[in-house]
Structure formats: structure tokens, C-alpha cells
Amino acid sequence: MWRTPASTGPLRQDRQMFFHATLARSFINALSVRGDDDAVDRLNYYYTPLILAVCCLVISAKQYGGTPIECWVNPHSRESMEEYIESYCWIQNTYWIPMYENVPDDHTAREEKQIGYYQWVPFILIAEALMFSLPCIFWRLCSFQSGLNIQTLINAACDGQALLDASDRQKAVEAITTNFVDNLDLQSPNGRIRARGWIARIKFSRFLSGQCLSILHSFTKLLYSMNVVAQFLILNACLKSSDFLFFGFQVLNDIWAGRPWTETGHFPRVTLCDFEVRYLANLNRYTVQCALLINIINEKVFAFLWCWYMILAIITTCSFIYWIANSFIHSEKVDYVMKFIQIAESSEFKKLQKFEKDATVERLYTVIAFAPHLLDTFVSDFLKSDGVLMLRMISNHAGDMIVVQLVRNLWQEFRERNWREFEEHEEMKDVEMRRIHGGERIVISNPGQTKSFL
């Protein structure tokens, strides 16, 4: 017995729905949330694909499990013929002519008004989800090739911050500091650790030394911003529209003005379909009117996605500008590190007051006031752009307190490596303080005794 394409539909529809669900679930699970990103990155590579997957499942349920199209045929036609016409019109595309216009006799004019996107909406959404994840994949591959263990540092910092015992937490910070310093040494061509990977070799150039990770991170942010803009262009092409950039404004304006879809043509519900039937060696052409029920859902989905993409574009662009400024403007990096230095100094001063209540505690004068270039050297030559970037990432995920302890240890490491210059400026500081106090003998707390890292 001859079977129409629609008669084999249930099994095929179940397989297609299972394919879409499995593909979306596997894709999302492969991009798990990690610590080497921020909230804006997660909105792009994790939550947006999740939203697109949900939209894909909703549309697929209607498209493959429901009735996406219904066509009005001759009441005397057999049921098999009705199913055939609906299957044909679904596959072959339909076209929209406003009710107040006459249907053109020219078939070429009809083809120019064809609507051919509704069958491909689930695939379009999956492709968009993949595109949103590409910058994340690029970042993870390149950061791994750079040889820097960012994820390990952030995970260790989060675990260390969760420790309640002070001694255990201090040991954890010391271990993180050692790992951090090793990563910093890797930024120099003369580092103790041999670089592996093509990115690690490229970054040893004079220009990229200590900035490779920051450049990769900023470029990834740029990719996120460019991707959101590209989504509007892709939807313009898929929907055969030149104004999807303003689609949301148009829909809201139509709703406000009370204009129905029959006038605007946005995701039309009623369309026309031409098909040919060979009967007794003659080719007969017919036109039927069809109801695209799937377009009711498509309109709501794309209106929501337009609003989401617009919000995401603004947030992602602001995030890109923020990270560019913080990664490459020297004063921003110095101010950021100085903030933690001041917090650590204040903490040490309060501890000294607490344990020496009967003693006269002088203000802890730092060498930075007498040699500000040391702080610049600490940021530009020791931490470099990549070190400051890693501090920011650790702060975003583990909190500021562990970064305070980490900066204190890093400053101590910097002092040990530049002890001659520090001793010279310590002597200059003592002379200056005696001059300020009129030659009186001023006792300045020894950094080693007061545990001050400055």
C-alpha cells in the first residue's frame, strides 16, 4: 500500500525531536561554568545558549510533535490528499500576499514573496547557540596553550578562602603565591619554566611579554561583542529582512498602535501555497491558503531574542571597554594594586596596636611615599598586565581578602628580589623622617618586626 510522507510522520518526528534535544543537552554540558571568566562571559557562552536551547525545544515540540501548518483544501478531497498538500507546502515554502492585494499571476512575483525560514528555525537557534560559545572555546584553548594555570589558581584561591583555620588559610595563600610567582616568571623569556605551546612561544616577544593573556582576554571580549552584533545580521539574512536591528522597536510600535500582522507582514499566520498535480498526463497547478500556526510561536521567540540580544550587546560592549581600560591603562593597574596594599598596611597597623596596647605605636611609614617608582616597577615589571588580570579574576571569584594576602606575599617576593634598591630607599626614608622632625630620633618600626610587608 502506498504511504504518503505524512503517514510516516510520527516515528520521524520523534527521532527528530530526540536529535534536537540530545544535541542541545550535549552542547550545553560541554560548556560548563568555570572560574576564568566573569558574569558577562557566562551570560554569553552559558545562559544565552541555554535560552536558545529552550526556545529550540519549544518550537521543535510544535513543529515535529504538533501541527505547524494547516491548509484549506476542497472539502471533498481525501484525507491523504490533505496531508500530502500540507507536507508539500511545509517543505516547499509558502508566500504572503496582503488580503487587500490581488494575487499576482506571475509566478516569479510569487516566488519573490516566499517565506522560507520557518522550517529552519530550530537549526538557526542551534547555530546561534554554537556561535555564542565559540569565543569561550577560543579563550579556553588559547589560555591553556599559554601555559598559565589560571583555572588552578582561581580554584585554589576559592578553596583557600573557604578554610576557617587561619594557619591552614595562610599555608594555602603561600602555596598560591608560589604558583602565582611561577606563572609570573613564565611571562619572561628568562623565566625558570620552559614555555610550551605556540602561544607561549609567541608571547615571549618583547611586545607581548607579560601581556599575552591580557591581549587574549581582551580579544575574547571583543569576539563576544562582535558575535552579538553578528546575530542581528544573521537573523536579517535568515528572515529575509533588512531591518531586524529595529525589529523589536517595530513590533512594540505595532502593538502600541494596534496594527495587526495582516498589515505589517511580520511572521504572517495566513499564507498561500502553489503546488502542481500530474493527472492524466496533464500538469495542473493549484493554489491553497494555509495557516502557519508555528509563526505565532516564532514571533514571540524572535521578539524576546531581539530584546535579549539588545540588552546583551550593551552589557557586553560595556564589559569589553571596562576590561580594556583595566588591562592596559597603567594608572588603573597601579590604583588597583595600591588599594590592596593600603588594605594590607591598615590591617598590619591594627594588629600592631592590638598586641602592643601599652606601647606608643607610630604610623607605619612606607617606602612608597619616598620611592613611588617602586610601586610602578612592581606593577609594570613584576606583576605585568597578566599578573594584574589574574588578581582581578581571583578577586571576582574568591573575594578581596585573599587577594590582600596574596598581594602582601607578592610584594614581599618583589622586595627580596630587589633588596638593594629597597635598602637604599629605606635609608633615604629614615633621613627624611629625621629632617621632618627637626633632628629628633624617630623610632620607625622595622618591617620584619612588625610584619609589615612594606
UniProtKB/Swiss-Prot annotation:
Q: What is its main location?
A: membrane
Source organism per UniProt: Caenorhabditis elegans
Output a single Gene Ontology CC term carried by this record: plasma membrane
Question: What keywords appear on the UniProt entry?
Answer: Cell junction, Cell membrane, Developmental protein, Differentiation, Gap junction, Ion channel, Ion transport, Membrane, Neurogenesis, Transmembrane, Transmembrane helix, Transport
Expression by tissue, per the entry, reads: Specifically expressed in sensory neurons and interneurons in the head and tail. Expressed in neurons AWC, ASH, AFD, ASI, ADL, ASK, BAG, AWB, and ADF (head sensory neurons); ADA, AIZ, RIC, AIY, and AIM (head interneurons); PHA and PHB (tail sensory neurons); and PVC and PVQ (tail interneurons).
Supply the name of the protein.
Innexin-19
**UniProt topological domain (Cytoplasmic) ranges:** 1-48, 140-214, 322-454
What membrane topology was assigned to this protein in its record? Multi-pass membrane protein
Q: Which family would the database say this protein is a member of?
A: Belongs to the pannexin family.
